[in-house]
């Protein structure tokens, strides 16, 4: 086990760090959701459960996140069957009112994953949180993808070392993922680079439809193995390519909203952190007193979907500045971090 002093965030590597016991991680996952197979104990036919799984629904929690209209669209499921399935799922999952104390108790399952920079972690209240979407937007070379690469490694640290003790799913829409970049970051954290790469599942998306289908396929993997992070880099790129002009803007925003809804459901269903990067566009209404005004792409649809929004900009040399743009529980503030060969780290004076 690696001796990591998180008070000073200095990562020493006298040994090799591996994921914690697989059985322990799987037991933690079982506490997060109820498997769709448990519907059989409530009198639901095994064949109907298989149809739900074929449609990408693997947990009772995920089932309750679908409308009955969507469920009746699954081949072989009538309205009567859907009603019976939903009634059975409600016996296994509480989807009604709970007290504020219960919400507070549920929040204790939130895991905060270190970014590699103590200053950035403090800005975020401890790190990137599970059960929510964190969006980072900024110009090119502002550090968005570098944070993503560092999180690919830090997520695999034990929870006691400010990690997530889980695997990572990476959906790449711009071709910016570099496995060779992971190697020095893993070495910095004292981890076996080969094992770290094996715990990252990667997919290159080429259209917005492909991107959405990749999200649907994730449910099967996340129901079987302990995942703690989903990265989408970048969330908006393919939508800006596949939809052009004002005539297709309404359809684009509708499809974008559906995909963001899916991301939200994944975060809450499997207790994973969703980190997505976003591009910026020129802001004609930015005002004459702001030099080169820019705003995040995606409009209000994307703004409402992200729980925490981070604005990144270039600093001096390899330094970058992160500002809390929007968050329900964090004050508007800034932190300076640095991009190093070992990933994101605290800035050096």
From Swiss-Prot:
Q: Where does dsDNA bind?
A: 240, 246, 252
Q: List the disulfide bonds.
A: none
| An annotated GO cellular component | condensed nuclear chromosome
Which example biological process does GO assign this protein? DNA recombinase assembly
Which SUPFAM superfamilies does its entry note?
Answer: P-loop containing nucleoside triphosphate hydrolases (SSF52540), Rad51 N-terminal domain-like (SSF47794)
In this chain, ATP is annotated as bound at 138-145
Domain of life, per UniProt, equals Eukaryota
Binding residues annotated for ssDNA, in chain numbering: 240, 243, 246, 252, 320
Q: Report the GO molecular function annotations.
A: ATP binding; ATP hydrolysis activity; ATP-dependent DNA damage sensor activity; DNA strand exchange activity; double-stranded DNA binding; single-stranded DNA binding
- Record Pfam families: Rad51
Return the PROSITE patterns for the record. RECA_2, RECA_3
What keywords were assigned to this record?
Answer: ATP-binding, Cell cycle, DNA-binding, Meiosis, Nucleotide-binding, Nucleus
Q: What is its main location?
A: nucleus
Protein localization? Nucleus
The record, for SMART domains, names: AAA (SM00382)
Q: Its quaternary structure?
A: Double stacked ring-shaped homooctamer.
Q: Which PANTHER family match?
A: MEIOTIC RECOMBINATION PROTEIN DMC1_LIM15 HOMOLOG, RECA/RAD51/RADA DNA STRAND-PAIRING FAMILY MEMBER
What does this protein's UniProt record list under function?
May participate in meiotic recombination.
Q: Which family does it belong to?
A: Belongs to the RecA family. DMC1 subfamily.
Instruction: Tell me what this protein is called.
Output: Meiotic recombination protein DMC1 homolog
State the gene name recorded for this protein: LIM15
């Amino acid at each position: 086990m690696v001796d990591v002093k998180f008070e000073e965030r200095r990562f020493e590597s006298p040994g090799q760090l591996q994921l914690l016991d697989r059985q322990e991680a799987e037991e933690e996952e079982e506490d997060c959701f109820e498997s769709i197979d448990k519907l059989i104990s409530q009198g639901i036919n095994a064949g109907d459960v298989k149809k739900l799984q074929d449609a990408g629904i693997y947990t009772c929690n995920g089932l309750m996140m679908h409308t009955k209209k969507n469920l009746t669209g699954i081949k072989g499921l009538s309205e009567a069957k859907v009603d019976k399935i939903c009634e059975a799922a409600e016996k296994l999952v509480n989807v009604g009112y709970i007290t504020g104390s219960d919400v507070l108790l549920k929040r204790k399952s939130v895991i905060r994953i270190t970014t590699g920079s103590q200053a950035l972690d403090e800005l975020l209240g401890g790190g990137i949180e599970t059960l929510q979407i964190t969006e980072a937007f900024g110009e090119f070379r502002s550090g968005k993808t570098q944070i993503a690469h560092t999180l690919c490694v830090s997520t695999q640290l034990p929870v006691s070392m400010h990690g997530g003790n889980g695997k990572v799913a990476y959906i790449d829409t711009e071709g910016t993922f570099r496995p060779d970049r992971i190697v020095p970051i893993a070495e910095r954290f004292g981890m076996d680079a080969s094992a770290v790469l094996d715990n990252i599942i990667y997919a290159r998306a080429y259209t917005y439809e492909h991107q959405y289908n990749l999200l649907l396929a994730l449910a099967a993997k996340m129901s079987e193995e302990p995942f703690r992070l989903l990265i989408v880099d970048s969330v908006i790129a393919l939508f800006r390519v596949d939809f052009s002009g004002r005539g297709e803007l309404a359809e684009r925003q509708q499809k974008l909203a559906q995909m963001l809804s899916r991301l939200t459901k994944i975060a809450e269903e499997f207790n994973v952190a969703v980190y997505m990067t976003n591009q910026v566009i020129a802001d004609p209404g930015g005002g004459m007193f702001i030099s080169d005004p820019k705003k995040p792409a995606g409009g209000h649809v994307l703004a409402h979907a992200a729980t925490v929004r981070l604005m990144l900009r270039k600093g001096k040399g390899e330094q970058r500045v992160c500002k809390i743009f929007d968050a329900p529980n964090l004050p508007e503030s800034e932190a300076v971090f640095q991009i190093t060969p070992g990933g994101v780290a605290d800035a050096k004076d």
